């Protein structure tokens, strides 16, 4: 059964997972949420012995039902590969009596690598499924970690381009260096005069100018 997505502001209109990924936000400005929450078809005992990639597939196949097994596994394996400094991807480490899930093993050492590594591959696959032939251009504003993680995730992914806007003097020197030294034929970084709110408002204005 195909799991559909609705807006948090309107339950009448539904879209597929790939359509939601391409749109980002619903037409009414709401967020896309699944019309129902599916149940996993694997047990906790089975999950604990799975690799990160296997776990990702077990979860994602329940939510992205218009993707084939081959498509989903390609996205997952393209995202969670040697860009991470451990094959485990997100190790669960015991320190004393506490367990910690380490989310800093990605390309930029930020937890946002977990999502932004797979997003470009999901978007490209979604575009192909919906007969979108143009390049996907990502415009985003950042005040720190997101910019570098997004640049690293989309760098040299065919069919995509990314432009990151940040406030000059509004990010740390290290964060600025991380962004402006990012390699990739499809990446651009723009410093603006103003603060993060100005950068974010500018990006929103571009999207609203139809």
Question: Where on the chain are the PLM-derived regions?
Answer:
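PLP-dependent amino-acid enzyme catalytic core
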Residues: 1-210
């Amino acid at each position: 059964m195909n799991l559909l997505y609705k807006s948090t502001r309107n339950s009448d209109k539904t879209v597929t997972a790939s359509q939601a990924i391409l749109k980002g936000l619903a037409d009414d400005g709401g967020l896309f949420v699944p019309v129902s929450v599916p149940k996993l078809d694997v047990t906790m005992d089975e999950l604990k012995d799975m690799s990160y990639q296997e776990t990702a597939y077990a979860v994602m196949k329940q939510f992205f039902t218009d993707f084939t097994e081959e498509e989903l596994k390609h996205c997952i394996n393209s995202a969670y590969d040697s860009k991470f400094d451990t094959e485990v991807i997100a190790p669960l480490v015991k320190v004393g009596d506490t367990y910690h899930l380490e989310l800093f093993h990605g390309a930029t050492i930020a937890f946002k690598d977990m999502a932004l590594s797979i997003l470009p591959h999901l978007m490209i696959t979604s575009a192909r499924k919906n007969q979108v032939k143009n390049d996907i251009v990502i415009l985003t504003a950042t005040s720190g970690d997101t910019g570098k993680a997004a640049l690293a995730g989309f760098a040299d992914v065919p069919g995509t381009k990314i432009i990151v806007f940040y406030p000059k003097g509004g990010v740390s020197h290290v964060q600025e260096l991380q962004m402006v030294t990012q390699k990739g034929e499809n990446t651009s970084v723009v410093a603006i005069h103003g603060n993060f709110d100005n950068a974010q408002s500018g990006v929103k204005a571009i999207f609203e100018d139809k």
